[in-house]
Amino acid sequence: MTTHVKPIVLVGPAGVGKTTVGKKLANSLGLSFLDTDALFVKDHGPISEFFAVNGESAFRRLEEDYLSYALSSSGVIATGGGAILSEANRQALKVATVVYLKTDGTHMHKRLSQGTRPLLKN
């Protein structure tokens, strides 16, 4: 008999390590891993470029779709840093075990300075 496991969703600010922790957690538990930002990039290209052309609101609408898709799995899901800003996403997350990750500012600054995060340019 197979037991359905609630998805485990990692939330937290950009650069906290949701993807890194998510991959390790999924591997340890023998579960699948999905990264909603990676799914977005696969379909639409770099998030920073999408932001520049289409704006944050267009990104957030699509982000809701990717989270909804990911929640249909029973694995570990890493969300984008702003995913919980959406009321629709907060409601959707009620079906999951949600884990908030945090770290110190020095660690996050080091991670974020290595990439192109669209909201850091504001």
What are the residue ranges of the model-derived segments?
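ATP-dependent small-molecule kinase phosphotransfer cores
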Residues: L34, A38-A92, P118
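P-loop (Walker A) phosphate-binding loop of NTP-binding proteins
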Residues: P13
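A glycine- and Lys/Arg-enriched "phosphate-lid" helix/loop adjacent to the NTP-binding pocket
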Residues: V95-N122
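Short glycine/serine/threonine/alanine-rich loop segments
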Residues: L31
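Hydrophobic anchor at the beta1->P-loop junction of P-loop NTPases
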Residues: L10
